[in-house]
Design a protein with these regions (language model features):
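Viral virion structural and adsorption modules
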Residues: 1-168
Length: 168
């Protein structure tokens, strides 16, 4: 199945629809203007809709699958995800392994290899999330004694100057 994103006048995705591959193949093929025009004739634009742009469900073109609120960048020919936080800046060379692709935080992600030792002597990774109010990464220590007994969760923050997790 082929997927097409409806874009508004600011290239923001309004919705994504599915079209049979055979219809795309018969009308110019993948990523063609002809296929986009065919979809426009087949499925009328709504509201501020201006154009249809094909998107790839398996990310084989245009960087990533478009979602509602994403932006299409015509000069780079790719879809950009919604900005997650006001302090983050666009970085189209972002790393998916670092947890972000299109947007970069002002403080680098600590990484999955930052670990703590739980009360039973087991090593475990922190679960990091961004705190916009404090401009820092905060992590959880989740202690699990057994499958039925979750222990106390401890909050920490990442201190990039010392490269350590510190208690909140």
């Amino acid at each position: 199945m082929a997927h097409f994103a409806e874009l508004d006048s600011n290239n923001v995705v309004l919705r994504v629809i599915v079209i049979d591959n055979s219809e795309v193949d018969s009308n110019g093929g993948d990523q063609s203007t002809q296929a986009e025009e065919y979809v426009k004739d087949l499925v009328p634009l709504e509201g501020d809709g201006q154009v249809w742009k094909q998107t790839s469900f398996n990310n084989s073109f245009r960087r990533q699958f478009a979602g509602v609120g994403f932006t299409y960048d015509p000069s780079a020919d790719l879809f950009i995800s919604v900005k997650p936080y006001a302090s983050w800046t666009k970085n189209l060379q972002g790393s998916a392994s670092a947890g972000y692709v299109d947007w970069e935080p002002p403080v680098a992600w600590p990484g999955a290899d930052v670990e703590y030792t739980d009360p039973w002597g087991n090593k475990a990774p922190y679960f990091w999330d961004w705190n916009e109010d404090n401009g820092r990464w905060q992590g959880n220590q989740i202690f699990e004694k057994d499958s039925d007994d979750l222990g106390v969760s401890k909050r920490v923050y990442w201190d990039p100057s010392s490269s350590t997790a510190k208690d909140i």
